[in-house]
C-alpha cells in the first residue's frame, strides 16, 4: 500500500505503470483499485516467484490476472534500458541491494528509470529500514544515486509492523 498509494495521490493522471520486482502481486493488487490506469508492465526476473505466490498467497496475488497487466520475465535493469518516456509511474519493489538485485541500485539503473518516465512521471523505490546500520548505509548510497538522475527527490516513511524494525522508507 505505501509503495503505491502516495504516488497515486500526488500524480494527476497515471495511465501507464512499470513495476520492477513485486512478483508477489501486492503492488498490482493496489494499482487495480485505480480504473484510470490503462497499462501495467510488471518485470519480475524469476517466474517461480509469481507462480509460488499465485499458489500460496492468493490474497496478495489475486489481481495478477488483471487484463491491464503484462508480465515480463526479465531483468529489470535490462528491461528499462529500452524504454523512453513511456511511463507515468515506475515502482521499484526490489530485493536487497546485493546479490541478484544489485543492478537495481546503480546510477545507470536510476538514470534509465528517469529516461523511461514521461516529463511529469514519478519513481518510487523502497529504501529499507533506517534502523539497521547496513540497511541505512545502503539506503543513503541508493538515495545519493537517485539524486544524481532525478532533480527532485524526496523520502517518505511508513510504519509497517510486519517489516523488520516496523519502520520503512520509500
Predicted region positions:
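Substrate-binding/catalytic lobe of Class I Rossmann-like enzymes that use SAM or dcSAM, i.e.
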Residues: 128-170
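The AdoMet/dcAdoMet-binding core of the Class I SAM-like
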Residues: 1-120, 124, 132-139
Amino acid at each position: 500500500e505505501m509503495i503505491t498509494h502516495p504516488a497515486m495521490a500526488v500524480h494527476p493522471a497515471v495511465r501507464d505503470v512499470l513495476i520492477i520486482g513485486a512478483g508477489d502481486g501486492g503492488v498490482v493488487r493496489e494499482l487495480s483499485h485505480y480504473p484510470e490506469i490503462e497499462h501495467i508492465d510488471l518485470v519480475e526476473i524469476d517466474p517461480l516467484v509469481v507462480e509460488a505466490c499465485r499458489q500460496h498467497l492468493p490474497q496478495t496475488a489475486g489481481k495478477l490476472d488483471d487484463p491491464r497487466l503484462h508480465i515480463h520475465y526479465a531483468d529489470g535493469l535490462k528491461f528499462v534500458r529500452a524504454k523512453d518516456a513511456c511511463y507515468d509511474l515506475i515502482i521499484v519493489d526490489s530485493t536487497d541491494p546485493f546479490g541478484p538485485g544489485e543492478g537495481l541500485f546503480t546510477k545507470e539503473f536510476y538514470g534509465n528509470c528517469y529516461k523511461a518516465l514521461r516529463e511529469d512521471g514519478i519513481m518510487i523505490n523502497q529504501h529499507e529500514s533506517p534502523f539497521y546500520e547496513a540497511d541505512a548505509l545502503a539506503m543513503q548510497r541508493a538515495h545519493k544515486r537517485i539524486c544524481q538522475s532525478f532533480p527532485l527527490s524526496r523520502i517518505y516513511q511508513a510504519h509497517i509492523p510486519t517489516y523488520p524494525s516496523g519502520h520503512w522508507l520509500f
